[in-house]
């Protein structure tokens, strides 16, 4: 059996300084390095042809300027989303429409390299317009936490829906207790890493938000509501959560300190 060749891809990391819940998040130090450096190094380990950091802040650009293989796209300050920022990055970088772009969030300092590469491979071989990852939900807290996005897939592995609500809704189990994950069924949490061709990235950024995106505040629903496919793979190894709050940062710092 001949295995398909690994995907050729670039990684683009949107990074803005003005995070509401954790100001200056990309520059917060984890161990002896800023968070954005950890993320860029994970992308390089994944085998990306190039890594780009898309930012509107010179301090973030300076923090990774010394890393070989990492480029900086200085983007505008008015972008409403990371997708908009990456669309500008793609134009600055001059990627052709078929370039495989993996969008790695700037707050994922422990992203497994295998997971990043898996998104690129899934995009290449699935035929879908977008690709992303999921992981099993292992706690009732995550299942009912609206900050943990859940998803359901069809038999082909394409996303049917993303929601902040616990989906699928277990009618019998959830009616009586919500302190454990039901044994029957599979609940998946979304991991916010995306793969798409550079041409589709431009179309995505140009689409107006749909009703579902406005209700759930989930940008990927814009793609589904417009009728495009999002292929979803279950991550091949545990995927630590990203860093959104000061408590998340403290846990990440403790993890590195104890390693």
UniProtKB/Swiss-Prot annotation:
Keyword Cytoplasm: yes
Gene Ontology CC annotations of this record: cytosol
Entry keyword set: Cytoplasm, Lipopolysaccharide biosynthesis, Nucleotidyltransferase, Transferase
Pfam families for the chain: CTP_transf_3
Organism listed in the record: Xanthomonas oryzae pv. oryzae (strain KACC10331 / KXO85)
Gene from which the chain derives: kdsB
Key word DNA repair present: no
Catalytic activity: 3-deoxy-alpha-D-manno-oct-2-ulosonate + CTP = CMP-3-deoxy-beta-D-manno-octulosonate + diphosphate
SUPFAM superfamilies given in the database record: Nucleotide-diphospho-sugar transferases
One record GO biological process: lipopolysaccharide biosynthetic process
Entry GO MF terms: 3-deoxy-manno-octulosonate cytidylyltransferase activity
Primary role: Activates KDO (a required 8-carbon sugar) for incorporation into bacterial lipopolysaccharide in Gram-negative bacteria.
Primary localization: cytoplasm
Organismal lineage: Bacteria, Pseudomonadati, Pseudomonadota, Gammaproteobacteria, Lysobacterales
Protein name: 3-deoxy-manno-octulosonate cytidylyltransferase
Location(s), subcellular: Cytoplasm
Family classification: Belongs to the KdsB family.
InterPro entries hit by this protein: Cytidylyl_trans, KdsB, Nucleotide-diphossugar_trans
Source domain of life: Bacteria
Pathway connected to this protein: Nucleotide-sugar biosynthesis; CMP-3-deoxy-D-manno-octulosonate biosynthesis; CMP-3-deoxy-D-manno-octulosonate from 3-deoxy-D-manno-octulosonate and CTP: step 1/1; Bacterial outer membrane biogenesis; lipopolysaccharide biosynthesis
EC number: 2.7.7.38
